Regions:
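Extracellular carbohydrate-recognition regions
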Residues: 3-56
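Secretory/extracellular carbohydrate-interaction modules
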Residues: 78-161
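Short, aromatic/His-centered strand-loop micro-motif at the edge of beta-sheets
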Residues: 164-193
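Extracellular carbohydrate recognition
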Residues: 240-251
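Extracellular glycan-recognition surfaces and repeat-rich motifs
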Residues: 47-75
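Localized edge beta-strand/strand-to-loop motifs within extracellular or lumenal beta-rich domains
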Residues: 190-204
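Extracellular beta-strand elements of beta-rich domains used
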Residues: 41, 251-255
């Protein structure tokens, strides 16, 4: 079993009054045995040598927004789905994360509308493309062979976030949030941070409000990916109607995992 790795980087956790034990966990992030990627999109251009981007048809690929607007002063990238049904925009890091290395990803996002849209944030066994990880959410079927993600899909019966995963083409038992759960669904033009933390063949799912406060309970899925398979941290957004385009903004994209020989 790999060593434990920090899955919660929120400022609220540091200020939670739990003392030196919590602080020591955060010091782990500066140790030599952690591989990490942290992007606040402050450079003015997307690092295309690192990211794979996909934009179908009339969709607009992710690009850095001008920092002049106060809403973008922390560095923001935007992807646009276009107004064609089932058209998508997606962004991923390379295929170099593993459950065996306890890889974690965190994405702070906001979306322009929460009707006729599908959003996935998580790990998958291919880089960004026009195909999502989850085909259908009500009775989950998958395009990926291995991977797990937070999924929100207005084509589903319940319009809330669901934690889903697939291991060697076998679907895990997912969890769909109740409508009464904290952070159960995206809120229009409001930031939320979604975290997926792999632990060998399993994964933990958590979510945080715009000010970094934890929302609801952490969810654990078992057998939701194959720990030895390389996965790509990915954000995928798909239009679910042909009448209106959807924008998704990403404030930060983080990934970290254990470094091993």
């Amino acid at each position: 079993m790999a060593d434990r790795i920090v899955t919660d980087l929120s400022d609220v956790r540091l200020r939670s009054g739990m003392g030196a034990a919590i602080t020591s966990e955060f010091l782990q992030m500066n140790s030599f045995d952690i591989c990490k990627w942290e992007d606040d999109f402050l450079s003015g251009v997307l690092t295309t040598s690192v990211y794979t981007s996909s934009a179908g048809g009339a969709a607009t690929a992710f690009a850095v927004l001008a920092p002049s607007a106060s809403a973008n002063e922390w560095g923001v990238i935007r992807g646009v789905t276009g107004a064609t049904d089932d058209q998508a925009v997606a962004l991923s890091l390379p295929l170099q994360c593993k459950g065996d290395y306890n890889a974690v990803m965190a994405v702070r996002y906001r979306i322009s509308a929460i009707t006729t849209v599908k959003v996935e944030i998580g790990f998958r066994d291919t880089v960004a493309s026009q195909t999502g990880t989850v085909n259908a959410l009500d009775t989950p079927s998958f395009s990926a062979t291995n991977g797990c993600c937070w999924a929100f899909d207005t084509d589903a019966t319940v319009d809330t976030w669901a934690a889903e995963g697939v291991k060697a083409s076998s679907a895990a038992t997912g969890v769909t949030l109740a409508t009464t759960a904290g952070g159960a669904a995206p809120v229009v033009d409001t930031y939320q941070t979604m975290v997926v933390a792999l632990m060998e063949d399993n994964a933990y799912f958590s979510r945080y409000s715009a000010d970094g406060r934890k929302q609801g309970d952490t969810i654990m899925l078992t057998d939701c990916n194959t720990g030895s398979i390389n996965l790509a941290p990915t954000v995928y957004v798909q239009n679910r109607a042909g009448s209106a385009s959807r924008n998704i903004d990403i404030d930060f994209f983080k990934m970290w995992q254990l470094r091993r020989s």
